[in-house]
Amino acid sequence: MKQLYRKLIPLLIVFFTQFSFAHTTSDKSDLYDQCVDHTLQKLKLDKINNTIVQSCSNETKAVYKKQIITVLDKIRQESQQESQPDRYLNILKSQRLWKSYVDKECDNAGTFIGSPMYSYCPMQEYRKRVDQLREYVDL
């Protein structure tokens, strides 16, 4: 058990140090950061905690999920206009595979890094996916 703690503690310190640094240096226009800042002010707290991470991650992920749906709809429309139904179907297949990957990868992150990752990891992956899908359309 001691050996596990000796390996786990440095990993957690590195994770939370990087997480804290990323939070303080990131773009303030980021939805997640805005949520965290607003919640800290609203609750009159000085530091972020796991509940705030979970709440803001879930809230931000919901926004990205809507954006993904919007972009997928745009891809569907473009595919119809260009008579390329396979294009849309292939992207839907990759979307399902991507979702399975995110679910498993973020479950691993939560298990091995810590519980905040169960919500923070999917939010990050959804943001990346929005950017990735936008490359496929003329927005």
Report the location of each language-model feature.
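Bacterial N-terminal signal peptides that target proteins for export
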Residues: 1-9
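Intrinsically disordered, low-complexity segments enriched in polar/charged small residues
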Residues: 11-12, 134
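N-terminal signal peptide c-region/cleavage motif recognized by signal peptidases
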Residues: 15-19
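N-terminal alpha-helical modules
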Residues: 21-139
